[in-house]
Curated annotation (Swiss-Prot):
Ca(2+) binds at D326, E328, R437, D652. It holds the Pfam family cEGF. It comes from Mus musculus. This is Growth arrest-specific protein 6. The modification Phosphoserine is found at S68, S614. Its main location: secreted. Gamma-carboxyglutamate residues are formed by vitamin K dependent carboxylation. These residues are essential for the binding of calcium. Residues 50-91 form the Gla domain. The gene is Gas6. Residues 1-27 form the signal peptide.
Length: 674
């Protein structure tokens, strides 16, 4: 039967139980690596009974008396522990004296030498537990530490970023996951979740907030840029970026380019550059060199002046072919001074009229068929001994008795003045006033048996004196001029006292040659354009190429309507403006409004103010106004007749008309030959 354990063994057992109790009260969970370290196979000492025996041998052999290395070998029974123990044993004797001196510190020093974990050689911060081995020890490291003494920090971020979804920060013995700006760390401590900054209404202020992964963006409509300082969308001035080839106008969130319409330019498809306005419908513009156009001089002055001198008394004989759609005007004058003897052959209401004055006595006679039908007919005037005979197509339509001769004797010669397309004196000096302007054509003329050959040469040299070879009814605008009128659009109703009402109603029948041009416009004395009706080939706000008719007050489009402007057909454009109403129709189809009810009322109030002042009516174009004063400033090219407030506009009655505009005739569309 073995002997009972000694005091040292009992003390060791108690310490072991205390350690186990302590460990059990604080559960320690080791990672797999630590557990493997702790359970790692090693050369263990003998069972506890032998450990206790060894401690007793050590007490007897080396504490109570001095032991040699061989005696120590007998205690430990192995070289590693002996090699570890004996040098330190000698150190204990040097420090605390030999055994026989009975120094308690010496006994304690020797008794602790076999436990290589006392004092603990492992790093205190990084060690979970120190294992005593034969002449050695093993440090079991806590998470985040490594190395023999557990004093080396393990960089967990090296492998798979430490499990962090974004940022891994290594720390002594540990690590921490972090997130980029705009993300927050989830409850698992590893995953980063996007922060939706747009949930805060103040994030972008007036702008739209768009959440992005880890960020956000403040968005503005096109034409605006975001100011982070003021948190507002601010207008971009595109005109500072030289986007337009010619004139640029900035507007909130947008801009518009304008081209010199009067110079024959319009916007290109890119809506920034300019291009020429070119015809899309060909008109038959051929002229006849054998014809004489009577309507070239809008002033009413004659286009031809002849003076005949004869030695012998001579009678007038005139014959010519004539064609017109014009109901009124002067064909020719023959005679002397206004207060002497003369005749004027003209048209009134489409029929021939002869005004004559002999010896201060004036008469008027009119007879014959209506001849302003646009077809050629031969007209002749023959002075007989006591009569004037006028024939149409060889048929006498007038025979007038006269007392005197048209050729007047002066200084020994017989004189006769002859003017074509006008009179040589004021209209007021006629027997009855007549509008002398005549859009008519003459050919095969014969004045006094062909003694006027110089006229033919003059006409050949000047195309403006020549007529279109073929014409139709209407007015032709060549694209380089306009006509003006002084019209009144307001009236005071007697039924309602002094209240002034106003109305602008326009009916335009057009056959355009180009897709851009002003049909009609009102212009104030300050060059403001209160109203304009025009053809345009783009939608200004949508910046889209499209053939349209636009109705505008100043530079604001009230209504738009599509039109097939290049189809060679006649179209009817109807415009009506009055209190609370603005309509545009093309061929009976109503156009689309471009303004709100409030904006319309504001524009109509502005128009009313202009109409109560001085306005001029322009047809076919605009004067030299700013290119931004109206949506279109280009001249109209094509055929057109106009009716304003129920009255047909006769271009012969205009205040001014460009000489290239033909008042009552228009060349036909030139159809391609198969």
């Amino acid at each position: 039967m073995p002997p009972p354990p000694g005091p040292a063994a009992a003390l060791g057992t108690a310490l072991l139980l205390l350690l186990l109790a302590s460990e059990s009260s604080h559960t320690v969970l080791l990672r797999a690596r630590e557990a493997a370290q702790f359970l790692r196979p090693r050369q263990r000492r003998a069972y506890q009974v032998f450990e206790e025996a060894k401690q007793g041998h050590l007490e007897r052999e080396c504490v109570e008396e001095v032991c040699s290395k061989e005696e120590a070998r007998e205690v430990f029974e192995n070289d590693p522990e002996t090699e570890y123990f004996y040098p330190r044993y000698q150190e204990c004797m040097r420090k605390y004296g030999r055994p026989e001196e009975k120094n308690p510190d010496f006994a304690k020093c020797v008794q602790n030498l076999p436990d290589q974990c006392t004092p603990n050689p492992c790093d205190k911060k990084g060690t979970h537990i120190c294992q005593d081995l034969m002449g050695n020890f093993f440090c079991v490291c806590t998470d985040g530490w490594g190395g023999r003494l557990c004093d080396k920090d393990v960089n967990e971020c090296v492998q798979k970023n430490g499990g962090c979804s974004q940022v891994c920060h290594n720390k002594p013995g540990s690590f921490q996951c972090a997130c980029h700006s705009g993300f927050s760390l989830a409850s698992d401590g590893q995953t980063c979740q996007d922060i939706d900054e747009c949930t805060d209404s103040d994030t972008c202020g007036d702008a739209r907030c768009k959440n992005l992964p880890g960020s956000y963006s403040c968005l503005c409509d096109e034409g605006y840029t975001y100011s982070s300082k003021e948190k507002t969308c601010q207008d971009v001035d595109e005109c500072q970026q030289d986007r337009c080839e010619q004139t640029c106008v900035n507007s909130p969130g947008s801009y518009t380019c304008h081209c010199d319409g009067r110079g024959g330019l319009k916007l290109s498809p890119d809506m920034d550059t300019c291009e020429d306005i070119l015809p899309c419908v060909p008109f038959s513009m051929a002229k006849s060199v054998k014809s004489l156009y009577l309507g070239r001089m809008f002033s009413g002055t004659p286009v031809i002046r002849l003076r005949f001198k004869r030695l012998q008394p001579t009678r007038l004989l005139a014959e010519f072919d004539f064609r017109t759609f014009d109901p009124e005007g002067v064909l020719f004058f023959a005679g002397g001074r206004s207060d002497s003897t003369w005749i004027v052959l003209g048209l009134r209401a489409g029929r021939l009229e002869l005004q004559l004055r002999y010896n201060g006595v004036g008469r008027i006679t009119s007879s014959g068929p209506t001849i302003n039908h646009g077809m050629w007919q031969t007209i002749s005037v023959e002075e007989l001994e006591r009569n004037l005979v006028i024939k149409v197509n060889k048929d006498a339509v007038m025979k007038i008795a006269v007392a005197g001769e048209l050729f007047q004797l002066e200084r020994g010669l017989y004189h006769l003045n002859l003017t074509v397309g006008g009179i040589p004196f004021k209209e007021s000096e006629l027997v009855q006033p007549i509008n002398p302007r005549l859009d008519g054509c003459m050919r095969s003329w014969n004045w006094l048996n062909g003694e006027d050959s110089a006229i033919q040469e003059t006409v050949k040299a000047n195309t403006k004196m020549q007529c279109f070879s073929v014409t139709e009814r209407g007015s032709f605008f060549p694209g380089n001029g306009f006509a003006t009128y002084r019209l009144n659009y307001t009236r005071t109703s007697l039924d309602v006292g002094t209240e002034t009402t106003w109305e602008v109603k326009v009916v335009a029948r057009i056959r355009p040659a180009t897709d851009t041009g002003v049909l009609l416009a009102l212009v104030g004395d300050d060059d403001v354009v209160p109203i304009s009706v025009a053809l345009v080939d783009y939608h200004s706000t949508k910046k889209l190429k499209k053939q349209l008719v636009v109705l505008a007050v100043e530079d604001v489009a009230l209504a738009l309507m599509e039109i097939k402007v290049c189809d060679s057909q006649e179209h009817t454009v109807t415009v009506s403006l009055r209190e609370g109403e603005a309509t545009l129709e093309v061929d009976g189809t109503k156009g689309q409004s471009e303004v709100s009810t409030a904006q319309l009322q504001e524009r109509l109030d502005t128009l009313k103010t202009h109409l109560q002042g001085s306005v001029h009516t322009y047809v076919g174009g605009l004067p030299e106004v700013s290119v931004i004063s109206a949506p279109v400033t280009a001249f109209y090219r094509g055929c057109m007749t106009l009716e304003v407030n129920g009255k047909i506009l006769d271009l012969d009655t205009a205040s001014y008309k460009h000489s290239d505009i033909t008042s009552h005739s228009c060349p036909p569309v030139e159809h391609a030959t198969p």
